[in-house]
Amino acid sequence: MMSRETLRALVEASHKRGKLAVVHVGTEQQARDAINASADGPAHMFTGEMAGADFGKFAASHSVFVIPTLATLYSTCGKSGAPALLEDPYLKSFIRPEGRVLLEQPWPYAKASCTGTATAMKELAEARVRILAGTDAPMPGTTYGASLHDELVLLVRTGLTPLQALQAATSVPARAFHLEDRGLIRAGMRADLVLVKGEPTRDIQATRHIIAVWKRGIRFQR
């Protein structure tokens, strides 16, 4: 366990070098310690019961972002979205064999509850804290690419609107990491695009029905 003094020193050293300080946390207290140490944001939400009822307001008052990695946390609670991904008609044919192995891999130890996770996420959403989509792949029950679609569903289930979930995977992380040339569809921006069938601003699962992908303006053949 890192001391608070060491944590603060590391955050300060990172900022002096012009770098963001994103801190791995596993409990509510660790998240609060990271935020109090002036970290730019904690990575991972926490499980179990919450000690306080003001985490969302606390995070908002420090202008941090949060990368909850719900896909992994819900896997630790025995509520993995992996089985649904493996059978999803739009995704399953694109999951590589090594990705399938990861999705089928059970978590080595299960936590009792994700109640605290859901409660904290609701508070963060109500306080309009910046949420960044991330999965923590390749942890058990997750894989690169496909698990992000599960993450978006969980973000909506725990308090974000579908539009906010889409922003959590596009414009919000681009701004948080100072990537000014991407994250939006706008003249002069990088043409990193995904075309889907449906209306993901109403039904977040529409992101799974991918028609085409472009990176730097070049269309990928699937």
Residue ranges of predicted features:
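Acidic, glycine-enriched loop/beta-strand segments at the rims
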Residues: 143, 161-166, 175-210
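Active-site neighborhoods of metal-dependent hydrolases
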Residues: 45-158
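Histidine/acidic-residue-rich, glycine-tolerant segments that coordinate divalent metal ions
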Residues: 1-34, 44-46, 50
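Generic structural signal for hydrophobic
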Residues: 10, 14, 34-37, 59, ...
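Divalent metal-coordination and catalytic microenvironments
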Residues: 14, 24, 42, 66, ...
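Short glycine/serine/threonine/alanine-rich loop segments
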Residues: 18-20, 39, 64, 129, ...
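Short aromatic-centered micro-motifs
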Residues: 213
